[in-house]
A protein has these predicted regions:
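Accessory terminal and edge-of-domain segments that mediate assembly/interaction
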Residues: 1-39, 50, 55, 112-198
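Acidic/polar N-terminal loop/beta-strand segments that form early-domain functional surfaces
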Residues: 6-8, 43-46, 71
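Gly/Ser/Thr-rich loops at beta-strand to alpha-helix junctions
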Residues: 11, 47-49, 74-76
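General beta-strand structural signal in soluble alpha/beta enzymes
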Residues: 21-22, 41-42, 68-72
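Catalytic-core regions built around general acid/base machinery
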Residues: 53-66
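Buried hydrophobic packing segments
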Residues: 58, 77-78, 132
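Class I SAM-dependent methyltransferase SAM-binding "motif I" and its flanking Rossmann-like core
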Residues: 74-75, 79-113
Length: 198
């Protein structure tokens, strides 16, 4: 059973035990649907440098009887939009999008390097910052008030400029308590996008 996975900055290709393709752009799912494939999984996709994968091409794949899954990033966005038509969403990010808890495409967007160097992310997704702050508050690393203030600060920069380092600097400038920022800086940050993709 052939499975094609569109993945880039969320997971390294060697972590995926199926046929790997670059992040999905317009036309990629349509081309894949013309192959002898039974399953297509969309994790990563393009937002800006090229047109995003179209809803219609996913619908064409579904009409051909190909199971189409989505998780973590562009896949979660498209799965939340196309679940009524049979696309299968996976993971906490998909659930948050499908329930309307998250509503913006830029929640999952990251800047990344080209494929020749493995699509390594060079910014942090807002959803990962949000999940990390929520987890830190649950563990008592920061207070709920600090969590809320930092989430608001995390939303302000353009997605290419979002990072934990930027968020901590913005928090210092905004007067967030320094002890909490120091504790947060030392705390291991979860990667919800990668967790959903796995």
């Amino acid at each position: 059973m052939k499975t094609i996975v569109f993945v880039g900055p969320t997971l390294r290709a060697r972590e995926v035990p199926f046929e790997v393709r670059p992040p999905a752009g317009v036309g990629d799912v349509l081309r894949a649907s013309r192959e002898r494939v039974q399953r297509i999984a969309i994790i990563d996709g393009y937002f800006e440098r090229m047109a995003a994968v179209w809803h219609k091409e996913i619908l064409v794949a579904l009409e051909k009887g190909i199971a189409v899954w989505g998780a973590a990033s562009m896949g979660a966005l498209r799965a939340a939009e196309l679940a009524p038509f049979g696309m299968i969403g996976v993971g906490a990010i998909y659930q948050a999008l499908s329930r309307g808890v998250l509503t913006s495409d830029d929640e999952v967007a990251v800047a990344h390097l080209p494929g020749e160097v493995g699509y390594r992310a060079i910014s942090d997704a807002l959803v990962n910052l949000r999940w990390g702050l929520a987890a830190a508050a649950r563990k008592g690393v920061i207070t709920a008030r600090t969590r809320d203030a930092l989430i608001e600060l995390a939303r302000l920069p353009f997605y290419r400029e979002r990072s934990w380092a930027r968020l901590l600097a913005d928090g210092r400038a905004a007067g967030v308590p320094s002890r909490q920022l120091a504790a947060l800086a030392a705390w291991p940050k979860p990667d919800q996008k990668a967790a959903d993709a796995r």
